[in-house]
Amino acid sequence: MSNKDYKKLYLVTDYRIPFNELLEKTKEALIGGVSIVQYRAKNKKTKEMCKEAKELKKLCDEFGALFLVNDRIDVALAVKANGVHIGQDDMEVSIAREIMPKDAVIGVTVHNKEEALKAIKEGADNLGVGALFSTNSKDDATLMTLETLREIKSVSNIPLYGIGGITPYNLNKDILENLDGVAVISALLNSDNIREKSKEFLNILSK
């Protein structure tokens, strides 16, 4: 198996955690093997977001990890992030592609095959698929069936990252065979030992 074939562990930050604490937790996750970090901040001022994103980008650069910003293309551009992740209610992928640098990574959250096909056609580089399990991070998350996940996999030629309530204990073979990695928040950031929890995830993803 080549490096590009390894399933990836993707951390999404939690804006409810004080930033200095979040920075330290993110570092532990990166040491543990996280290879993608998405900065997600709600109800924060742009100046504060830019400051935080800049520090996280610097940290990700130290570990050779990809750094993405959720929703806010302006913040992503300001801190020279590697890309953005956008949802169904955000800017169209095609417009984001025009604004972002040519080599920028654009991820999109999708919930069904139709949304996946549209995102791929418009130039998405990866898809966040879910929610696979119930989650406290997004109140309005609708659970995705295994059948829907398989439908998306069947039409996708770009990486798929599972999202929503994922832990090392609820991932099974049927789910994993349709994913290229998983994106997590609470399962890592609420762990007593983030570094070891990251390694635990990667061990499961490597099977």
Swiss-Prot record:
Q: Which UniProt keywords apply?
A: Magnesium, Metal-binding, Thiamine biosynthesis, Transferase
MF terms (GO), sorted A to Z = magnesium ion binding; thiamine-phosphate diphosphorylase activity
Q: Tell me the residue numbers annotated for binding Mg(2+).
A: 71, 90
What GO terms fall under cellular component here? cytoplasm
Q: Per UniProt, what is one Pfam family of this protein?
A: TMP-TENI
UniProt: 2-[(2R,5Z)-2-carboxy-4-methylthiazol-5(2H)-ylidene]ethyl phosphate binding residues = 135-137, 165, 185-186
Q: Which residues form the signal peptide?
A: none
Annotated GO biological processes are: thiamine biosynthetic process; thiamine diphosphate biosynthetic process
- Pathway listed for it? Cofactor biosynthesis; thiamine diphosphate biosynthesis; thiamine phosphate from 4-amino-2-methyl-5-diphosphomethylpyrimidine and 4-methyl-5-(2-phosphoethyl)-thiazole: step 1/1
Q: Which InterPro entries match?
A: Aldolase_TIM, ThiamineP_synth_sf, ThiamineP_synth_TenI, TMP_synthase
According to UniProt, the reaction catalysed is:
2-[(2R,5Z)-2-carboxy-4-methylthiazol-5(2H)-ylidene]ethyl phosphate + 4-amino-2-methyl-5-(diphosphooxymethyl)pyrimidine + 2 H(+) = thiamine phosphate + CO2 + diphosphate; 2-(2-carboxy-4-methylthiazol-5-yl)ethyl phosphate + 4-amino-2-methyl-5-(diphosphooxymethyl)pyrimidine + 2 H(+) = thiamine phosphate + CO2 + diphosphate; 4-methyl-5-(2-phosphooxyethyl)-thiazole + 4-amino-2-methyl-5-(diphosphooxymethyl)pyrimidine + H(+) = thiamine phosphate + diphosphate
Which residues hold 4-amino-2-methyl-5-(diphosphooxymethyl)pyrimidine?
38-42, 70, 109, 138
The broad enzyme category this protein falls into is: transferase
- Report if keyword Glycoprotein is assigned: no
For this chain's record, the cofactor binding note is: Binds 1 Mg(2+) ion per subunit.
Family recorded in the similarity comment: Belongs to the thiamine-phosphate synthase family.
Protein name, UniProt field: Thiamine-phosphate synthase
Q: Which organism is it from?
A: Clostridium perfringens (strain 13 / Type A)
